[in-house]
Amino acid sequence: MQLERLQKKLSYQFTNLDYLLQALTHRSAGAKNNERLEFLGDSILNFAIGKALFEKFPKANEGELSRMRATLVREQTLAILARQFGLGEYMRLGAGELKSGGYRRESILSDCVEAIIAAIYLDAGMDKAIEQVHLWYQDLLAEMKPGDAQKDPKTRLQEFLQGRKLPLPTYEVLDIKGEAHNQTFKVTCKIEMLEEIFIGIGTSRRKAEQNAAEQVLAKLTTK
């Protein structure tokens, strides 16, 4: 059975498979979808990773812990886990999402991972859900170190400019496309010391700004 293979990849056997099926169901495929599970799973994931970092780095300050957690729970990291599990093969998507390659989209994959975390919590309780998160993240957690590398691009760009007593960057939304639940933002980032205007794209304004800031940093550090 297909779900048996997935459960082996997840290293977890569900008592109630209905929880897993719901976690794999995108809103485009039906009314009983994974949106509520995603909401719950996001909270459990943040707590589980926060707990792991708190215990692993007793000398790290709040800012360092927050930045490391942000790196570990961001969409791109969750999508990497989803691909390791091969979630795209098992997800239930509506015809439109299937046609547009939704099973490859990072936002859909990451939401599914969060929904599965909530499904495990409902199936076996909080301790088991946290245990699974720690198991899935053990390699990533082993690589984490407090420090500047965990700061997001906007923070690093701001600190780069402040350290040189230069004006801060300005961000402006250039374009928003798509429906409310599936939007693409295009944002510009300008700094005084460069004539070029950098354009970032993302599924939220914040992500688009981070993308633009990353481009500016790349330009500044290769000058």
From Swiss-Prot:
Instruction: Locate the active site.
Output: 42, 114
Any idea where the DRBM domain is?
152-222
The enzyme class is hydrolase
Binding positions (Mg(2+)): 38, 111, 114
One GO biological process term is: regulation of gene expression
Q: Which residue numbers delimit the RNase III domain?
A: 3-125
Q: Does the keyword Nuclease apply?
A: yes
Q: Where in the cell is it found?
A: Cytoplasm
Q: Which GO terms describe its cellular component?
A: cytoplasm
Gene3D superfamilies (UniProt xref): 3.30.160.20, Ribonuclease III domain (1.10.1520.10)
Q: Which SMART domains match?
A: DSRM (SM00358), RIBOc (SM00535)
Q: Which UniProt keywords apply?
A: Cytoplasm, Endonuclease, Hydrolase, Magnesium, Metal-binding, mRNA processing, Nuclease, RNA-binding, rRNA processing, rRNA-binding, tRNA processing
UniProt-listed Pfam families = dsrm (PF00035), Ribonucleas_3_3 (PF14622)
| Self-association and partners | Homodimer.
HAMAP family tied to this protein: RNase_III
Task: State its role.
Answer: Digests double-stranded RNA. Involved in the processing of primary rRNA transcript to yield the immediate precursors to the large and small rRNAs (23S and 16S). Processes some mRNAs, and tRNAs when they are encoded in the rRNA operon. Processes pre-crRNA and tracrRNA of type II CRISPR loci if present in the organism.
Q: What is this protein called?
A: Ribonuclease 3
The record lists the organism as Actinobacillus pleuropneumoniae serotype 5b (strain L20)
